[in-house]
Amino acid sequence: MKQLLDFLPLVIFFAVYKMYDIYIASGALIAATALQLIVTYALYKKIEKMHLITFVMVTFFGTLTLIFHDDAFIKWKVTVVYALFAIALAVSQLLNKPILKSMLGKELVVADKIWAHVTWYWVSFFVACGLVNIYVAFSLSQETWVNFKVFGLTALTLINTVITVVYLFKNMPEEHKKELNK
């Protein structure tokens, strides 16, 4: 259920964009992201920092898009969010308090060196996606950017998640692998 909620704003943005335009879709994205927070809190009594940061960025850039009637703001939102995620992961790793390990380390027991590899892998991924977003957003058509944002970045994120899980599992001690397979 939680993963479905993560996709709700993206699906609504895409559907509204296809029916109307980028401006109505931006407003719908703001509303859907707010709804996502409300439903998540109602169901789980907790809101993750990532969702809160995304909501603030969607609201900020979406509002600027609507006020100035300029889609450049909503296009920049993607890169800014990825940059913030990359910075947060990098800083947490440099401070020896890796975010990914704190989120997943209880379920996936691996050496700190492996968590560092995973962290830097995701930092690189977020930076690359942010840079590619700039290229697609400002060099190609708006429709191409929307499709890239919805399908391309989602697919890349899912692929990288699978790669990460495989890498973590491969580097997990045998006794922990057996526990997970029970």
Curated annotation (Swiss-Prot):
It is a multi-pass membrane protein. GO terms for cellular component: plasma membrane. The keyword Cell cycle does not apply. The chain crosses the membrane at residues 22-42, 50-70, 72-92, 118-138, 148-168. It holds the Pfam family IspA. It is found in: Cell inner membrane. Keywords: Cell inner membrane, Cell membrane, Membrane, Transmembrane, Transmembrane helix. InterPro entries: YciB (IPR006008). Its main location: membrane. Belongs to the YciB family. Plays a role in cell envelope biogenesis, maintenance of cell envelope integrity and membrane homeostasis. This is Inner membrane-spanning protein YciB. The lineage of its organism: Bacteria, Pseudomonadati, Pseudomonadota, Gammaproteobacteria, Alteromonadales.
